[in-house]
């Protein structure tokens, strides 16, 4: 009897354990079913989103890349997990656009330039630049008549020419200092004496009040007292010059904004000056040999005829005729089917209308156009290729086809 009771108890314990294990298995099965349903819902949701994207205009979606192949991991990121839906992305984009538009409007209102402000800017630049030119470009050792003539020349010349002359002066001064480091103290003493004498002598000869001239000289050259070498640095000169111009203007503009505005309206070539003279062309050729057709900024500066570096480069190309031997590249067109048009529209709606290299990759992977392109390439002989030198650019052809399809659909809707 005792043995039978023990066996019965053991069987009861085993039965309880089995029941518990079965309950756990049932719960696991339920959880698995729930997970499968959630996955099915998520897949259906993403499928519907892709359908909506294909029907709408192109939007940007970040594709995950692995060995130069795009796959369905575009909906998954390792750090973040599943990225937000397209609706959330569109909301974020709208808010960013609103903020950017507000910022643009605010900046435009803050930095608005009127015609009066621009005229005043040109006047202040002209006056202050001529003061600096009288200080830097007129030597102390010259006679009184020569100084007056130089001052007249400075007053008649344009600001662009004065800037280039001051830059050349700084370059020469720096070159001399590299060779003669021992004579720095003597040169600085002579220039400091020029501050007091040069401006005062000009004022006496030109019948201008002496007290005003002295005040202006003190205001302009107040920074020379602390540093001796800093006044012969063009960068420091430009900073001080444009800071002074911005202080004199009534409109609250920075020195950089004043400089940009003056360069935009002042430093462009006149319509009358488009034709190049023989002297300019000869000088340009000499300077291009000197600088080995590279440093076009220095070439334009040494020309000293208000020519920009880009115009100097273009003129040099016209003279040497560098681009005559190169034949024009001809674009071959690809024929499209109706099915290919649909594929192209879907791909552009997913990838976007800017990354045409990706569009080309996917279109070629569908094996729709590649067979025709290969046939057309094999039909061409080797000698015909050398004569014609045709170039096939698939990206441009896909882009053109997509734009034509969009224009056709828009016309149909209208």
Swiss-Prot record:
Segments forming domain Myb-like: 242-266, 268-320, 328-381
InterPro entries: Homeodomain-like_sf, Myb-like_DNA-bd, SANT/Myb
Keyword Calcium: no
Application notes: Possible candidate for an effective malaria vaccine as determined by epitope response in sera.
UniProt feature coiled coil, ranges: none
Any one Gene Ontology cellular component term annotated for this protein: nucleus
Keyword Endoplasmic reticulum applies: no
Top-level taxon in the UniProt lineage: Eukaryota
SMART domains reported in the protein's UniProt record: SANT
GO biological process terms held by the UniProt record: positive regulation of DNA-templated transcription; regulation of DNA-templated transcription; regulation of mitotic cell cycle
CDD domains membership: SANT (cd00167)
GO molecular function terms attached to this record: DNA binding; DNA-binding transcription factor activity
Primary subcellular site in the record, as a coarse category: nucleus
Signal peptide: none
Entry keyword set: Activator, DNA-binding, Merozoite, Nucleus, Repeat, Transcription, Transcription regulation
Annotated compartments: Nucleus
Disruption phenotype: dsRNA causes reduced expression, alters parasite growth and trophozoite to schizont transition during the erythrocytic cycle.
Role of this protein: Transcriptional activator. Has a role in the parasite erythrocytic cycle where it directly regulates key genes involved in cell cycle regulation and progression. Binds directly to Myb regulatory elements.
Protein name: Myb1 protein
Organism this protein belongs to: Plasmodium falciparum (isolate 3D7)
């Amino acid at each position: 009897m005792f043995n039978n009771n023990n066996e019965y108890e053991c069987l009861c314990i085993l039965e309880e354990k089995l029941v518990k294990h079965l309950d756990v298995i049932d719960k696991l099965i339920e959880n698995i079913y729930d997970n499968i349903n959630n996955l099915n819902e998520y897949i259906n949701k993403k499928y519907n989103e892709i359908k909506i994207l294909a029907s709408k205009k192109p939007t940007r979606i970040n594709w995950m890349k692995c060995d130069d192949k795009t796959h369905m991991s575009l909906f998954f990121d390792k750090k973040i997990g599943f990225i937000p839906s397209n609706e959330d992305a569109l909301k974020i984009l709208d808010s960013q656009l609103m903020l950017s538009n507000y910022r643009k409007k605010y900046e435009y209102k803050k930095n608005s330039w009127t015609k009066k402000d621009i005229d005043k800017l040109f006047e202040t630049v002209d006056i202050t630049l001529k003061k600096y030119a009288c200080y830097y470009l007129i030597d102390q050792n010259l006679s009184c008549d020569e100084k007056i003539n130089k001052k007249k020349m400075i007053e008649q010349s344009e600001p662009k020419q004065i800037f280039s002359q001051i830059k050349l002066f700084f370059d020469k001064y720096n070159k001399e200092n590299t060779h003669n480091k021992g004579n720095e103290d003597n040169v600085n003493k002579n220039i400091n004496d020029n501050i007091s004498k040069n401006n005062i002598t000009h004022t006496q000869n030109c019948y201008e009040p002496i007290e005003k001239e002295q005040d202006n000289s003190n205001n302009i050259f107040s920074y020379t007292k602390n540093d001796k070498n800093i006044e012969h640095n063009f960068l420091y000169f430009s900073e001080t010059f444009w800071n002074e111009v911005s202080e004199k203007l009534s409109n609250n503009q920075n020195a950089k904004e004043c400089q940009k505005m003056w360069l935009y309206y002042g430093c462009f070539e006149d319509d009358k000056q488009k034709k190049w003279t023989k002297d300019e062309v000869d000088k340009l050729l000499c300077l291009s040999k000197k600088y080995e057709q590279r440093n076009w900024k220095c070439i334009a500066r040494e020309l000293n005829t208000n020519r920009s570096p880009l115009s100097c480069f273009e003129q040099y190309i016209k003279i040497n005729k560098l681009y005559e031997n190169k034949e024009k590249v001809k674009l071959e067109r690809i024929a499209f089917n109706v099915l290919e048009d649909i594929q192209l529209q879907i791909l552009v709606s997913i990838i976007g209308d800017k990354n045409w290299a990706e569009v080309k990759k996917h279109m070629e992977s569908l094996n729709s156009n590649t067979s025709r392109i290969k046939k057309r390439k094999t039909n061409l002989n080797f000698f015909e290729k050398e004569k014609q030198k045709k170039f096939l650019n698939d990206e441009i052809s896909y882009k053109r086809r997509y734009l034509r399809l969009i224009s056709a659909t828009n016309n149909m809707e209208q």
